């Protein structure tokens, strides 16, 4: 009986380890989008927008009147997720790449310095593989917890400023263009302006128009 129990424990442990090893790193939507992006080629005349739900939520080619813009945003993505799906972009050697990321990392208690380190790794990969690609690193936007929609962001308001400080330092070190969007979206309390959102994090149409106007000179 004792041997049987020991065997059962060993089998259960092996099964648990197997499940842990094969568990997906990201959610289903990430893989649906990432595998689609694998099948959609990038060319040297394209402008890539790489990001999370804020990027995913816009029709950038229509907003900016440029059919060469390719949206590579994925809802819920973290900066390491960008790195893990970067290869198809590197292969295409796009003309420009606009990057925004880090708020989902913050929701998982990742520090600004850690976000900066992963973002720097991503930028170095782009520079090494696509030396002619112009890189634009955009700041994080504020969020607004008055809406009480995202519990994992509660108490993390100041983390955005820390992350932006780290990201700007990355942009300076790597010699890429830094676009500070934060002041355009923050109210006097440092929160996302309530008229630009309906959930405290994501943008309504007016917010995307502000974003568009801030970056259109770089897209040309």
Briefly describe each language-model feature range.
Residues 1-48, 60-61, 220:
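N-terminal secretory targeting modules
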Residues 23-24, 66-79, 107, 200:
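Acidic/histidine-rich helix-loop elements
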Residues 40-44, 63-64, 91-92, 172-173:
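Extracellular/periplasmic catalytic domains that process cell-envelope and extracellular macromolecules
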Residues 49, 69-71, 178:
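Conserved beta-strand scaffold positions in the cores of enzyme catalytic domains, especially
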Residues 50, 55-68, 80-117, 136, ...:
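Oxyanion-hole/transition-state-stabilizing segment in secreted/luminal serine hydrolases
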Residues 112-122, 157-163:
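Charged helix-capping and loop-helix junction motifs
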Residues 130-134:
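A short helix->loop->beta-strand "cap" motif at the edges of active sites that frequently abuts
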Residues 142-220:
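Catalytic His-Asp segment of secreted/periplasmic serine-dependent ester chemistry enzymes
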């Amino acid at each position: 009986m004792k041997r049987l129990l020991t065997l059962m424990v060993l089998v259960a442990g092996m099964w648990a380890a197997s499940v842990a090893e094969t568990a997906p790193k990201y959610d289903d939507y990430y893989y649906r989008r990432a595998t689609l992006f694998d099948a959609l080629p990038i060319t040297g005349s394209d402008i890539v927008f790489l990001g999370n739900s804020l990027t995913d939520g816009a029709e950038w080619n229509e907003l900016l009147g440029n059919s060469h813009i390719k949206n590579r945003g994925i809802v819920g993505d973290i900066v390491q997720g960008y790195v893990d799906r970067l290869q198809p972009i590197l292969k295409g050697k796009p003309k420009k790449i606009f990057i925004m990321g880090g708020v989902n990392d913050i929701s998982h208690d990742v520090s600004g310095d850690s976000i900066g380190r992963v973002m720097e790794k991503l930028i170095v990969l782009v520079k090494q593989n696509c030396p002619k690609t112009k890189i634009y690193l955009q700041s994080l936007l504020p969020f607004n917890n008055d809406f009480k929609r995202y519990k994992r962001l509660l108490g993390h308001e100041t983390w955005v400023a820390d992350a932006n400080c780290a990201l700007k330092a990355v942009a300076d070190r790597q010699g890429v263009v830094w676009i500070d969007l934060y002041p355009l979206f923050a109210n006097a309390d440092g929160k996302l302006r309530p008229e630009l959102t309906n959930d405290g994090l994501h943008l309504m149409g007016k917010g995307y128009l502000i974003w568009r106007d801030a970056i259109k000179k770089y897209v040309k």
